């Protein structure tokens, strides 16, 4: 059984739900980038700001905002592994639907956080689902559209995430939050839950995964010898890939992320989300161009040029 057993309608459906899934994942990323004000208001509500001068208060806000960034990265990394393994075991479609429901429900629970520590814990757990959305969505699309160049499919999903970031930033620019309304951003982040339910109920599983699962079930005598990227001959290239992946992460999260709180300090309330919108537009264009370049000149050359930029 292969992807030819899927009708064109089923494959379009898979592409659509994967696109929407990572669109909502992008909104969650935008939320993480613009969550500094939520920390500020929670610090005030919880009484943590008592007896602090302005400089000490700003340092405390920045500290917890930095913790939120770390919570997102570690949570998404762990979620990619956990839900990726889950996708191998129970199917891409089910793992994708569960991951979307997971981060939607936990984002809703963040509405009830009473202080920055509670928010950090809830957001870390939510980010497990965000991290799980990417590998299962990409795997599902790659298996359903295997005859289409993978850079093109990855580009479409990557663009979805950046469109989600842009959309969230646009909403925050038009409707800045205050002490009375900041919890609404968590309600907004929960609107993706119905998509997860739709995926579980109506989207077919990848025939490629089904056939590989059947093959594994019929020959499970050498289970310990199953392929792993952390075993030879893949181990070396895996660590090279991990090392190369740190380049955009250092630029995107280690450096750029701090522009947003700095913008909040020196500019209007709309400046930070406007900057995030600009970054998202550039990323959307970059995702599209990267697919074209990768197909024409090769993936390695494309990645080298991307890292230079």
Show which residues each predicted segment covers:
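Extracytoplasmic
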Residues: 13-50, 251-260
């Amino acid at each position: 059984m292969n992807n030819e057993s899927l009708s064109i309608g089923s494959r379009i459906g898979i592409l659509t739900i994967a696109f929407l899934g990572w669109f909502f994942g992008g909104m969650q990323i935008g939320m993480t980038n613009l969550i500094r004000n939520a920390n500020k208001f929670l610090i005030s509500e919880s009484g943590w700001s008592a007896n602090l001068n302005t400089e000490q208060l700003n340092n405390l806000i920045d500290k917890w905002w930095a913790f939120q960034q770390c919570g997102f990265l570690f949570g998404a990394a762990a979620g990619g592994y956990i839900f990726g393994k889950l996708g191998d075991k129970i199917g891409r479609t089910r793992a994708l639907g569960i991951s979307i429901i997971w981060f939607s429900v936990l984002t809703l629970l963040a509405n009830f956080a009473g202080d920055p520590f509670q928010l950090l814990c809830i957001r870390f757990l939510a980010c497990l689902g965000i991290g799980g959305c990417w590998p299962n969505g990409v795997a599902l699309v790659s298996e359903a559209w295997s005859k289409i160049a993978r850079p093109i499919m990855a580009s479409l999903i990557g663009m979805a995430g950046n469109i989600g970031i842009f959309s969230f930033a646009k909403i925050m620019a038009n409707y800045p939050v205050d002490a009375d309304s900041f919890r609404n951003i968590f309600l907004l982040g929960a609107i993706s839950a119905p998509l997860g339910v739709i995926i579980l109920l109506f989207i077919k599983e990848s025939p490629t995964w089904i056939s590989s699962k059947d093959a594994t079930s019929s020959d499970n005598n050498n289970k310990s010898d199953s392929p792993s990227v952390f075993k030879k001959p893949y181990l070396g290239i895996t660590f090279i890939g991990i090392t190369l992946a740190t380049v955009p992460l250092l630029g995107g999260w280690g450096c750029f992320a701090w522009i947003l709180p700095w913008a909040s300090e020196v500019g209007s309330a709309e400046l930070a989300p406007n900057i995030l919108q600009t970054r998202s537009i550039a990323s959307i264009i970059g995702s599209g161009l990267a697919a074209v370049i990768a197909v024409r000149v090769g993936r390695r050359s494309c990645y080298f040029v991307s890292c230079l930029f």
